[in-house]
């Protein structure tokens, strides 16, 4: 096996140009089997406004996947209505010559195949050489693959390079999707503007190598090269499920730096050699070396679990940084790679991994959990090294671009250092400690759900044979046989049977409520009963993945399994599943929950005196607001306010922050839209500074294009911005998109800042556990609450310290409150 492996063993379209003969459209093209089968035309490029033969103006080239039936019949390139819609907009915007062409030049009845792309690529390559474009827009994955030889990222604003040209290729949505989806259409226009003014994005390391560190000279050379980098990015590939498999191991570990096009890769046999791995160990443990990873807590945890090394110097996470700079950005490496010219870097291994995943599922059936965790062992050594190396190189380049972006948003990076970096460390310990689950209780809960489902099936039996899991059969029963009506349609034109529709029909026929109950039971069975059992490890605990970047609001999310959407404790199912949450003998579970946190955050940020006074007084906030508006809203004195009025006030209080419409508020509290508006106006009228703050956040968002969260105050008492969330829909002509973006302008600061209070508290609690050697563990976090498992004799100490740590923050005179049970 060679010590150096090429990162890009295959070329792109530009390298396939054949200079010795012209490649003009040919109705009897000998290269393509598609013509012979479909008898379709071979359609060439439409030069549009470009003067024939004039390449001095460096045109834009737009590539569509292949001719439509309309193009084929008319013999006119790119004349289909979907293509024309794109053409009209591009021509009107760019004000420069544009050439339109295809990835595959002939129409076919089915989707474009890889073989057809390869057969037609010389034609496209000829176009690229002839027109020497400054930028290529590839509409649809087939068009993108025709140009660069790899798949497009899932996100529309990815890019790659056309070989050795000084020309980049931007992946755009399929033109047919743009024609039918207004959301994608509006997003496309904004992304097009960004890329049209992008300058010169970075090129991929076409001459880079994955260097296999298989001898001590190579190991020392790797250390010397990496230690000179501004920072070192690292990535691991593993076999097995951490916490669950005794044979969990590292298959490889790769390092790279932002100023390098090479990666240094230690494979499994090199990792197990103490002498050979010593330089890599020094990199991981040296606090003077700035380390960066993509979802770094996974890599850190894997290294700790597999080889016992603590990565003390980890300082950056490109995945989390991406979310801090742009909440709405998809943050997977396959997506981020497209922002630094590395798009498609995972394609070579993808097919092998998918085949191995299918093989494992076929082998073990439903018993296997997370088959992809075992699939990487099937990669040939060279492909594994290249895959791992490209991951490290991509992470380095992504992180470097984010590092540069932080120069424009220094407060965001400061917030990473002050809060989020520590949260990543703390969450890794929460995952490691795990949440205690009693397997027998889960089995008992599963049996109970089966009994309930059997009873509902008896209800279904009176309506004849139908499958309650089939949306088509449910629709047939409800709308054709029973005559109910749905006010919502699916994309295919059928009446919808989604949850919202069925809830509107609830009470109009017994079978509707039975179907809703059936779906709830099935979801509980798949998530918290049968679905929970494979996640209970030998230690009697569940070790979920807790994600720092899982929600746009900044809140943590949880998966494998999701422990954050458990039914409320005041419901039957909620009580039953909670019986499985059992601390180990001699220990107790403690839950600490912030009280009305988001409303307190709104008071802190707006400094509304009335809101602040209510919280300082310690009274029930929702009851007090109901009393404040009782005469205006309901025509009753404050002392006559009842529970129903408090419930209505609570809905409006949160609705103000979430931007709920009067119609939605009316449905929530069971009154007319007019009455809901009166309650809203009455409450908001008592909080004038809150109203002005909401208007100010919206005004600032429209000016800057961003919503912000806040953390701390400066010397003048002003809130310091922490995270940024671009609001791309503020200027949208679609009223729904625009309204959603406007709501986010003031909801993001509240929810995101509340999330940061929770993150900061988690860090402090975990630090306290370690610093004081406290006999307890922080075992789960759910939105505004944390759960600890502590020794019985330490409960009082735990409660006092938890309250102290969670309420210690600077809140501009608005006290925080924590409910502990």
What are these regions (language model features)?
Residues 2-203:
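A polyanion-binding, active-site-adjacent surface
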Residues 60-62, 70-71, 75-82, 86-87, ...:
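Conserved RNase H-like, two-metal-ion catalytic cores of nucleic-acid enzymes
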Residues 134-141, 233, 288-296, 589-591:
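Acidic beta-strand-to-loop metal/phosphate-binding motif
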Residues 148-154, 158, 166-169, 173-176, ...:
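Metal-dependent phosphoesterase core characteristic of DEDDh/y 3'-5' exonuclease domains
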Residues 197, 201-268, 309-313, 338-573, ...:
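Conserved "right-hand" nucleotidyltransferase catalytic core of DNA-directed polymerases
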Residues 390-397, 743-766:
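Conserved pre-motif C helix in the palm subdomain of viral-like polymerases
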Residues 668, 787-791:
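Short hydrophobic/aromatic beta-strand micro-patches
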Residues 686-687, 804-813:
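A common structural junction motif
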């Amino acid at each position: 096996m060679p010590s150096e492996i090429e990162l890009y063993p295959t070329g792109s379209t530009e390298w396939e140009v054949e200079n010795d003969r012209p490649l003009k459209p040919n109705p009897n093209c000998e290269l393509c089997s598609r013509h012979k089968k479909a008898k379709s035309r071979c359609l060439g490029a439409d030069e549009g406004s470009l003067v024939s033969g004039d390449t001095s103006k460096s045109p834009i080239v737009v590539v569509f996947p292949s001719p439509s039936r309309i193009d084929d019949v008319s013999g006119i390139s790119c004349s289909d209505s979907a293509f024309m819609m794109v053409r009209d907009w591009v021509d009107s915007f760019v004000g420069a010559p544009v050439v339109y062409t295809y990835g595959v030049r002939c129409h076919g009845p089915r989707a474009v195949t890889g073989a057809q792309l390869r057969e037609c690529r010389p034609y496209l390559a000829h176009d690229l050489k002839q027109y020497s474009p400054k930028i290529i827009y590839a509409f649809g994955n087939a068009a993108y693959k025709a140009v660069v030889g790899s798949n497009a990222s899932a996100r529309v604003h990815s890019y790659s390079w056309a070989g050795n040209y000084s020309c980049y290729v931007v992946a755009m949505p399929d033109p047919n999707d743009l024609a039918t989806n207004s959301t994608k259409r509006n997003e496309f226009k904004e992304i097009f503007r960004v890329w049209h003014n992008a300058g010169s994005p970075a090129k991929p390391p076409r001459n880079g190598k994955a260097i296999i560190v298989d001898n001590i000279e190579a190991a020392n050379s790797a250390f010397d090269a990496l230690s000179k980098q501004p920072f070192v990015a690292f990535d691991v590939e593993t076999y097995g499920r951490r916490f669950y498999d005794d044979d969990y191991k590292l298959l490889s570990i790769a390092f790279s730096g932002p100023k390098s096009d090479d990666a240094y890769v230690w494979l499994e046999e090199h990792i197990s050699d103490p002498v050979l791995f010593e330089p890599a160990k020094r990199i991981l443990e040296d606090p003077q070396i700035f380390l960066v990873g993509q979802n770094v807590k996974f890599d850190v945890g894997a290294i700790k679990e597999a080889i016992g090394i603590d990565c003390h110097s980890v300082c950056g996470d490109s995945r989390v940084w991406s979310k801090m700079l742009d909440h709405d950005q998809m943050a997977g490496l396959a997506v981020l790679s497209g922002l630094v010219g590395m798009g498609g870097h995972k394609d070579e291994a993808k097919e092998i991994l998918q085949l191995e995943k299918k093989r494992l599922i076929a082998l073990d059936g439903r018993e296997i959990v997370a088959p992809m965790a075992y699939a990487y062992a099937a990669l040939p050594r060279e492909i594994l090294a290249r895959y791992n190396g490209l991951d490290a190189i991509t992470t380095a380049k992504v992180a470097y671009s984010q590092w540069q972006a932080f120069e424009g948003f220094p407060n965001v990076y400061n917030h990473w250092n002050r809060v989020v970096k520590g949260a990543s460390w703390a969450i890794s310990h929460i995952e490691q400690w795990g949440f205690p689950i009693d397997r027998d209780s889960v089995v008992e809960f599963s049996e109970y759900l089966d009994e309930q489902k059997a009873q509902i099936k008896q209800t279904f039996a009176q309506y004849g044979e139908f499958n309650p899991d089939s949306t088509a059969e449910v629709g047939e029963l409800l709308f054709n046989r029973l005559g109910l009506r749905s006010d919502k349609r699916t994309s295919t034109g059928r009446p919808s049977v989604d949850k919202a529709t069925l809830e509107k029909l609830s009470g109009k026929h017994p079978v509707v409520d039975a179907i809703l109950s059936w779906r709830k039971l099935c979801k509980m069975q798949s998530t918290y009963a049968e679905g929970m059992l494979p996640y209970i490890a030998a230690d009697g605990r569940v070790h979920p993945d807790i994600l720092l970047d899982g929600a746009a609001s900044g809140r943590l999310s949880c998966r494998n399994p999701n422990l954050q959407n458990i039914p409320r404790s005041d419901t039957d199912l909620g009580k039953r599943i909670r019986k499985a949450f059992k601390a180990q003998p001699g220990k107790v579970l403690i839950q600490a929950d912030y009280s009305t946190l988001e409303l307190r955050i709104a008071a802190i940020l707006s400094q509304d005196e009335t809101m602040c006074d209510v919280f300082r007084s310690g009274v029930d906030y929702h009851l007090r607001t109901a009393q404040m508006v009782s005469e205006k809203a309901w025509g009753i004195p404050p002392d006559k306010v009842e529970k129903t009025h408090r419930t209505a006030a609570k809905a409006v209080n949160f609705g103000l922050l979430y931007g709920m419409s009067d119609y939605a508020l009316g449905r929530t509290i069971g009154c007319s839209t007019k009455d809901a508006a009166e309650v809203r106006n009455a409450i908001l009228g008592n909080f004038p500074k809150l109203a002005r703050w909401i208007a100010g956040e919206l005004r600032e968002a429209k000016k800057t294009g961003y919503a912000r969260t806040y953390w701390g105050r400066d010397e003048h008492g002003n809130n310091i911005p922490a995270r940024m969330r671009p609001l791309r829909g503020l200027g949208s002509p679609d009223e729904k998109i625009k309204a959603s973006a406007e709501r986010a302008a003031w909801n993001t600061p509240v929810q995101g800042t509340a999330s940061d209070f929770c993150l900061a508290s988690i860090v402090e609690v975990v630090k306290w556990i370690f610093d004081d050697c406290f006999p307890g563990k922080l075992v789960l976090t759910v939105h505004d609450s944390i759960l600890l498992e502590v020794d019985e004799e330490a409960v009082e100490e735990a409660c006092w310290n938890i309250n102290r740590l969670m309420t210690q923050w600077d809140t501009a005179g608005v006290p925080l409150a924590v409910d502990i049970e």
